[in-house]
UniProtKB/Swiss-Prot annotation:
GO molecular function annotation: ATP binding; tRNA dimethylallyltransferase activity
Alphabetic keyword roster: ATP-binding, Magnesium, Nucleotide-binding, Transferase, tRNA processing
Positions annotated to bind substrate: 13-18
Species: Granulibacter bethesdensis (strain ATCC BAA-1260 / CGDNIH1)
Key word Transferase present: yes
Name assigned to this protein: tRNA dimethylallyltransferase
Region (Interaction with substrate tRNA): 36-39, 160-164
Source organism, top-level taxon: Bacteria
Site label Interaction with substrate tRNA, positions: 102, 124
Sequence positions that bind ATP: 11-18
Keyword presence, Transferase: yes
Length: 319
């Protein structure tokens, strides 16, 4: 049986992945599937530069804005959802195009995770109750007695991961670290190719600053204010998205808007460095199934005719 095919469009934040994935999907008949850990959150369209409604209407888009900010996503959850979206896209005769900069997601999709049993609702409720009653640091201390290997890897303030580790220990009678040491479940039946955008660092820095200004003009502060009134746990993934902590500090009156902008830009730039390091050190697809573009893609038309032809031929040969 012929292997199914999927394409990654990968690169650091603000490199132009979404524009490129959309253009490829339009030209080759694809479905764009989100592989960004923050674009899954419903309330974060502006701050995560999610495709707008007009772009989403041009080709099928999946897994964008599907979780509320109050619900933590995970790589394991995303993997299950992405596999379903890929299968549906392939059955419809469309090329699955996974677009994002979260290297862990790409690695998880291809290589899988250990199969951790569901700890059950009773264990989840206990973890939530203890977290509310004791706070993360005290619950972390209890976890250190029950599952020291996992506790040693967690920060005492990381309430979501501490609660998850506690519920796994209580519900499965085995520590989370022990389950994670089990052999992973790789994804069979799929072949992957990748387009990786790798722009110069200074070009990326300028684009990040410009994007932040554009986000302010488009309502980023209102987006953060809508999160603030929900009084969510600050350790939730959505509350740690680039720009959210910084603009929250501004809205509280702790810092000025220029300082919030500077901090948000610096945090994003540091993140792009970590993304680049991940892609260099853990390549998820290697030549000849990897096509690299060494410039930021502001639009598909920015590519030269030769580059466009070469890239599309690369995809067609794989697909």
């Amino acid at each position: 049986m012929k292997e199914k095919r999927a394409l990654f469009v990968a690169g650091p934040t603000c490199s132009g992945k979404s524009a490129l994935a959309l253009a490829v999907a339009e030209r080759l008949g694809g479905t764009v599937i989100n592989a960004d850990s923050m674009q899954i959150y419903r309330e974060l369209r502006i701050l995560t530069a999610r495709p707008d409604q007009e772009e989403e209407a041009r080709v099928p888009h999946r897994l964008y804005g599907v979780l509320p900010a109050s619900q933590p996503g995970s790589a394991a959850w995303w993997r299950d959802q992405a596999i379903t979206a890929m299968e549906e896209s392939w059955q419809q005769g469309r090329l699955p195009i996974l677009c994002g900069g979260t290297g862990l997601y790409f690695h998880a999709l291809m290589h899988g995770f250990a199969d951790i049993p569901d700890p059950g609702e009773e264990a989840r409720q206990e973890a939530r109750s203890l977290l509310a009653e004791l706070g993360p640091e005290s619950l972390h201390a209890r976890l250190a007695e029950a599952d020291p290997a996992t506790a040693a890897r967690l920060k005492p303030q990381d309430s979501q991961r501490i609660a998850r580790a506690w519920e796994v220990w209580r519900g499965t009678e085995s520590g989370l670290s022990a389950w994670q040491n089990q052999p992973p479940r790789p994804l069979p039946g799929w072949d992957f190719a990748a387009i990786r955008i790798d722009p110069p660092r200074e070009e990326l820095r300028q684009a990040i600053t410009a994007r932040l200004h554009g986000m302010l003009d488009n309502g980023a502060l209102a987006e953060v204010e809508a999160l603030r009134v929900q009084a969510l746990d600050p350790s939730l993934p959505a509350m740690r998205a680039h720009g959210v902590p910084e603009f929250l500090a501004f809205l509280r009156g702790d810092i000025s808007l220029p300082e919030a902008m500077q901090r948000a830009a610096q945090a994003t730039i540091r993140y792009t460095k970590r993304q680049a390091t991940w892609f260099r050190n853990r390549p998820f697809v290697k030549p000849p199934f990897l096509y690299t573009i060494d410039a930021r893609i502001a639009s598909f038309q920015q590519l030269s005719e030769r580059s466009m032809a070469d890239m599309l031929n690369f995809i067609r040969a794989f697909h």
